[in-house]
Swiss-Prot record:
Example of a GO biological process term: cell division
Name of the protein this chain belongs to: UDP-N-acetylmuramate--L-alanine ligase
Places the protein is found: Cytoplasm
GO molecular function, a single term: ATP binding
Keyword Metal-binding: no
Gene symbol of the encoding locus: murC
Residues passing through the membrane, by range: none
Keyword annotations of the record: ATP-binding, Cell cycle, Cell division, Cell shape, Cell wall biogenesis/degradation, Cytoplasm, Ligase, Nucleotide-binding, Peptidoglycan synthesis
Binding-site list for ATP: 110-116
Disulfide links within the chain: none
Chemical reaction(s) catalysed: UDP-N-acetyl-alpha-D-muramate + L-alanine + ATP = UDP-N-acetyl-alpha-D-muramoyl-L-alanine + ADP + phosphate + H(+)
């Protein structure tokens, strides 16, 4: 295995996961990216994978080059050099589409919940049998002996179209990525095209009106909470501060009781989808049940830490539906605490398109603090929307804060702080953690 894989933009969540997976399969891997720290690079560094600054000297015609989708000749020296010198490269999704042909592949698509569900499916299946997987939180695992491959299937710019998996879950369809999709119908059409490429089994959330219209040549299995019209049904829910317990039926047949140590109704649905897929694929449900109990979650999805007796939750939620799910999970685990949301809107286009929905979602918290909008590299701020526009629509106690001054967050007793966003919301979180630590130091 002398070939070197070079990743242009290796810190991207999907790219870093793929790099780790290929490294673990015995391939030589390196990559390039900006110097700014990103949470995915820790895993790369621990694996001993070299991360270089962008430079045309990084490229060699004998390499297999995989390029992040955001990089073009006008914004990246390596892409420009490759184009000028006839050096071939594949985009992430193009490489993945050909890579998965050697496995029994299982995809997880959907507007929300992809990463958590991919993580759950990967965790369970890899404990049952040798499995390679790619999770959108930057986690990847590879094995030269794996028969199965689990991956996150991303709809943005229809990147999932090169994929033809045997099985796939679609968690939901929702209007997002307004910088690319023109309407909910456009989003549906993308998912419907993807669904037609599944070959053995498609598992969709049956209480999503859009998903009910999905068509596929593969058998379609619906899962949900409602007995009528769904194949896999979760019932007898018991939600507590230690997780969720529920029973699953398949077309009237009791498949037994299951427990997950995660929170929120959405995670019960994620687990039901995983159970349905693995049951249909012929796996022992006793093993599925056993390994669901130990699923601890994925990075930046309801990730908790305690600083000076203060609970801080970090979550990637950046769409109203995701915010509602995250706040629901926080209330399940901490029913007696005040839920304080600290949210950074991600992209101006999404903020404009979903402004009222964001306000409705954030009003599920007891208090709301807003960071300045985090603009995407793909867009320009034309001044059409400001974070104050969102603040004005929030009914609960609210305030706009800066990363330099997060002290207003101290105005709460017995609170859980839920930091949400897909930009650099973690810098606000770290600023708050330093403030809490300094308070203790001063007291001591």
């Amino acid at each position: 295995m002398s070939k070197t894989y070079h990743f242009i933009g290796i810190k991207g969540s999907g790219m870093s996961a793929l790099a780790l997976m290929l490294h673990q399969m015995g391939h030589k891997v390196q990559g390039s990216d900006v110097e700014k720290y990103y949470f995915t690079q820790r895993g790369l560094e621990q694996a001993g994978i070299t991360i270089l600054p962008f430079d045309e000297k990084n490229l060699d015609g004998d390499m297999e080059i995989i390029a992040g989708n955001a990089f073009r000749p006008d914004n990246n020296v390596e892409i420009a050099y490759a184009d000028q010198n006839g050096i071939s490269y594949k985009r992430y999704h193009e490489f993945l589409g050909s890579f998965m042909r050697d496995f029994v592949s299982m995809g997880v698509a959907g507007a929300h919940g992809k990463t958590s569900t991919t993580g759950m499916l990967s965790h369970v299946l890899s404990h049952i049998t040798d499995t390679s997987f790619l999770i959108g939180d930057g986690t990847g695992r590879g094995s030269a002996n794996a028969k199965y491959f689990v991956f996150e299937s991303d709809e943005y710019e229809r990147h999932f179209m090169p994929y033809h998996p045997e099985y796939s879950i679609i968690t939901n369809i929702d209007f997002d990525h307004p910088d690319y999709f023109t309407s909910l119908e456009d989003v549906f059409n993308a998912f419907n095209d993807y669904a037609k490429q599944i070959t053995k089994g498609l598992f969709v959330y049956g209480e999503d009106a859009e998903l009910r219209k999905i068509t596929s040549d593969a058998p379609i299995y619906y899962y949900g909470f409602e007995a009528e019209g769904n194949d896999f049904v979760a019932s007898d829910l018991l939600r507590s501060t230690t997780g969720s317990t529920f029973t699953v039926h398949f077309r009237g047949q009791n498949l037994g009781q299951f427990h997950i140590p995660t929170f929120g109704r959405h995670n019960i649905m994620n687990a039901t989808a995983v159970i349905g897929l693995l049951y249909t694929a012929g796996f022992d449900l006793n093993l599925v049940r056993e390994h669901l109990k130990t699923f601890a979650g994925v990075k930046r999805r309801f990730t908790e830490k305690i600083v000076n007796d203060t609970v801080i939750i970090d979550d990637f939620a950046h769409h109203p539906t995701e915010i509602i799910a995250t706040l629901d999970a926080a209330r399940q685990k901490y029913p007696s605490k005040e839920i304080v949301a600290v949210f950074q809107p991600h992209t101006f286009t999404r903020t404009i398109a979903l402004l009222d929905d964001f306000a409705h979602a954030l009003n599920q918290a007891d208090a709301v603090y807003l960071a300045q909008i985090y603009g995407s590299a793909r867009e320009v701020d034309h001044g059409d929307v400001k974070v104050e526009d969102l603040a004005n629509k929030i009914n609960k106690k609210h305030q706009v804060i800066t990363v330099e001054n997060v002290s207003p967050l101290l105005d709460h007793d017995n609170a859980v702080y839920v930091f949400m966003g897909a930009g650099d919301i973690q810098t606000y979180e770290y600023s708050f953690e330093r403030l809490l630590s300094n308070l203790t130091s001063n007291v001591q």
